[in-house]
């Protein structure tokens, strides 16, 4: 958030929305998980962020993904911050960016107990 507040266009920001992805103890289908590993396509990530920064009202998008190492339950996986003018624009941009990251940028390997 401090980095966003230093953005030269911060005066246009009316909302900062954050997604913090965490390793949970169960998979989507309910199986117990002991951890996971995430691989990231960095070129595609840059493209996704650049495209979504062009959405109406968006000032900044910042992403950090903890990749290429084993993560355990409770570890942070991803932090995504979207700053923009109004709620509707910021929520739409966060949703679109997150969906694109999950479907086009990252590959997750879960380790089951």
Describe every region a protein language model picked out.
Residues 1-77, 83-113:
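N-terminal, polar/charged subdomain of small-to-medium soluble alpha/beta proteins
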């Amino acid at each position: 958030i401090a980095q966003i507040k230093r953005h030269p266009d911060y005066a246009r920001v009316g909302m900062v929305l954050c997604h913090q992805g965490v390793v949970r103890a169960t998979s989507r289908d309910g199986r117990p998980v002991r951890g996971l590993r995430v691989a990231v396509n960095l070129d595609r990530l840059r493209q996704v962020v650049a495209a979504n920064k062009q959405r109406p009202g968006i000032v900044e998008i910042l992403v950090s993904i903890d990749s290429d190492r084993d993560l355990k339950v409770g570890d942070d996986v991803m932090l995504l911050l979207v700053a923009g003018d109004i709620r509707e624009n910021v929520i739409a941009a966060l949703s679109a960016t997150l969906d694109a990251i999950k479907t086009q940028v990252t590959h997750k390997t879960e380790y089951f107990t």
